[in-house]
């Protein structure tokens, strides 16, 4: 059961990382696909160049939150709901705590680089 929880949280971290805030902010608020303008990159720098700072700031903040959430929040969830009987308890400062942070953070980065919602590109 404990490995299943870790796998589910890692998949959730990947899915959170796959959310392209630049793409969605551009579509929702400006009606454009940011990947068709500027450097054709769905990133906050391209949003800044094409749409300006009023759109780039929320895109950047959303990108920071989507990397922070899996690394810190998921480890706090593990500590809150998992018991030492499950073998996944990660006390702050322990080796497991940092390994889970690295795992979930790396999955969010992989999701950011290869987003499933944008066809892995």
What is each stretch, according to the model?
Residues 2-26, 54-121:
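Alpha-helical transmembrane segments
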Residues 23-56:
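Cytosolic, membrane-interface loops and tails of multi-pass inner-membrane proteins
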């Amino acid at each position: 059961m404990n490995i299943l929880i870790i796998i589910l949280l890692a998949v959730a971290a990947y899915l959170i990382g796959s959310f392209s805030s630049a793409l969605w902010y551009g579509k929702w608020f400006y009606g454009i696909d940011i990947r068709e303008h500027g450097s054709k990159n769905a990133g906050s720098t391209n949003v800044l160049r094409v749409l300006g700072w009023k759109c780039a700031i929320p895109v950047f903040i959303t990108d920071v939150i989507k990397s922070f959430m899996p690394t810190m929040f998921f480890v706090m969830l593990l500590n809150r709901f998992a018991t030492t009987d499950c073998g996944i308890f990660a006390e702050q400062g322990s080796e497991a705590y940092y390994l889970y942070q690295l795992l979930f953070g790396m999955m969010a980065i992989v999701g950011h680089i290869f987003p499933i919602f944008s066809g892995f590109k």
